[in-house]
Amino acid sequence: MDAIKKKMLAMKMEKENAIDRAEQMEQKLRDVEETKNKLEEEFNNLQNKFSNLQNDFDTANEGLTEAQTKLEASEKHVAELESDTAGLNRRIQLLEEDLERSEERLQSATEKLEEASKAADESERGRKVLESRSLADDERLDGLEAQLKEAKYIAEDAERKYDEAARKLAITEVDLERAEARLEAAEAKVWELDEELHIVGNNIKTLSIQNDQASQREDSYQETIRDLTQRLKDAENRATEAERTVSKLQKEVDRLEDELLAEKERYKSISDELDSTFAELAGY
C-alpha cells in the first residue's frame, strides 16, 4: 500500500512537472511567435522600403535618360549651327573678293565698298556662333550679291561713259549717285546683320549655359543612382538576413511544437496511468 502511495505521489509530481514544462513550453512558444511576428513585420517594412528604393531608382534613371536626350539634342543643334556657319563664312569670303574687284572699276565707290568689306569681315568672325537664322541670312546675302552685281554693272557702265564725251558726264554722275544710294542700303543691311549676329551670340551663350546645367544635372543623377544602388544592396542584404532569421525561428517553432505535443502525450499517458491506479485502489 505504501508503495502504491509513493508511486502515486511520484506520478503526481511527475504530472505537475510535466504540466509546468508544458506551460513553460507554451510560454516559450508564445515568445517565439511574438518574435517571429516582429521579424515578419520588419521583413514587410524592409520589402516596402525596397519597393520605394526601386521606385526612386527608376525615377532617377528616367531623369538621367531625359537629361542625356536633351544633351544629345543640344550637341546636335550646335553641330548644325557650326555647319551652317562654315557655309556662310565661305559665301562671305566670296563676297569680299567680289567687292575688292569692284573697287578697280568704280573708284568713287571704293571707300564705301571697303567699309562694307570690313563689316563683312566682322560678321565672319561673329558667324561662328550663328543660330538657326541661316535661311534669312542667305536671303540677305543674296541681296548683297545682287546689289554687288548691280554695282559691277554700274561700274562697267561708268567706265564706258568716262570714255565718252563730256555730254554724258551728267548721266554718269546720276548713275554714280544711284550706286552710292545702293551702297548705303548695303551698309544698312550689313549693320542689320551685325545686330542679328549680336543677338545670335547671346542665344548661343544661353545654349552653352543650358548645356553646362544639363551636365551638372547629369552628374547629380549619376551620384543619386550610385547612392540608390548602394541603398538597394543594403536593403537586399537586410532582407536576406531577415529571411534567414525567420527561417531559423520557424524551425525553432516547429521543434517547440513537437516538444509540446510530446509533453501533452506524456501528460495524457500519466493521467491515464493515474486513472488506472485510482481504479485499482477503488477495487481494494
From Swiss-Prot:
The family this protein is said to belong to: Belongs to the tropomyosin family.
UniProt keyword Transferase present: no
Top-rank taxon, per record: Eukaryota
Pfam families: Tropomyosin (PF00261)
Coiled coil: 1-284
Keyword terms of this UniProt record: Coiled coil, Repeat
Region: Disordered, residue numbers: 103-131
Biological function: Tropomyosin, in association with the troponin complex, plays a central role in the calcium dependent regulation of muscle contraction.
Description of how the protein assembles with itself and partners: Homodimer.
Full protein name: Tropomyosin-1
Domain notes: The molecule is in a coiled coil structure that is formed by 2 polypeptide chains. The sequence exhibits a prominent seven-residues periodicity.
InterPro entries: Tropomyosin
Record carries keyword Coiled coil: yes
